[in-house]
Amino acid sequence: MRSVINVLGNAENVFKLIENNLRRVISNVIESIVAIVVNEGNCINSDVSVTEERIATGFYIDKDVIITVSHILSNFKDRLCIISLDGDIYKGTVISVDEDNDLMFIGVDVSRRPLKIEDTLISEGAIVFSSGIAQGILRHFITMGIVSGLEVRSIINNREIEGLMLLNMPTIPGMSGAPLLNIDSNVVGMLLSRSFSYNEFSLALPSSRIFLSYLILRKLGKVVHIKLGLKLLQSPNALKKLKLENGLMIMGIANKLLFKNCNISVGDIIIEVNGKKINTLEDFRKAIALSILDNMSIELILFSQKEGLKRCHVDISSAHLY
């Protein structure tokens, strides 16, 4: 009986710890979270009208820059009204849109404390929190869950987005664009949509994608991407057979110039990009994005079963920059 009581007591302590941490996380971030309303009025109380398709949550990533989802925007002429949880309403202006990641960057004249963005990928099984704006009542909704899976693909706003996180976490309409938070109150992702039409599952974009897109925007004045035209696969079993510690297997090559100039073959393993070891698909995406920031060519180190190690230099101009 005493052991049962001890177990129940320990469980109660765990739940209290989770509850206290959740309260702390939300209190740390709540002032930086806002509602984004696409509106035809003038951003005053009597003019702001809300529909599910035209409202999202957003959060500050800089003192005068808010990030949210781009799928609520029909064109760049749309008027954006920002509504804080303490009732302030002010205008927002679209700075740039990253449709590949369903991101929209909004400039505002009202400064608030930005949230800290993690630039590393969170692991499966991690506990995460979020707070977003509930559509219809414009009040914040708090939710908690776990990261159930990585590298999920989904069609959002008629575009396929890859490398998403699958969350076992309920959300409600209006929460698209809400920050996904870790126990340290740092952003590890952004909610994009509910998954499979069930409220219990959600999809989120990794924070590293947000972090790099914003750095590229600050440097170039717009968000651009490099597309090498390679289809890659994470295959631990293949790496084990080849006695390799890390790498991604090439499963398809759409870029004919890359195929011709580098003699890359299906089955080759990309081990490094610009001196950085590649373990995951997100590592690869990050390394390619960093080449834009560093304004440098791309050097791939590959392993071929026939040729062993080989190098491939890719000039950015020979890749698909968009």
What residue spans do the PLM features occupy?
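Conserved active-site neighborhood of the chymotrypsin/trypsin-like protease fold
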Residues: 9-13, 41, 53-55, 60-140, ...
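Gly/Ser-enriched beta-turn/beta-hairpin loop segments
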Residues: 45-50, 95-101, 150-165, 216-223, ...
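Conserved PDZ fold ligand-binding element
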Residues: 63-67, 188, 259-282
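PDZ domains, with a preference for the canonical peptide-binding region formed by the helix
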Residues: 74, 272-301
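Flexible, gly/ser-rich surface segments that form the specificity/activation loops bordering the active-site cleft
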Residues: 114-160, 196-202, 216-221
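Active-site-proximal beta-strands of protease catalytic cores
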Residues: 33-37, 66-70, 121-134, 167-170, ...
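PDZ/PDZ-like domain micro-motif
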Residues: 174-179, 236-242, 254-272
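C-terminal cap/linker of serine protease catalytic domains
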Residues: 2-26, 187-245, 281, 285-289, ...
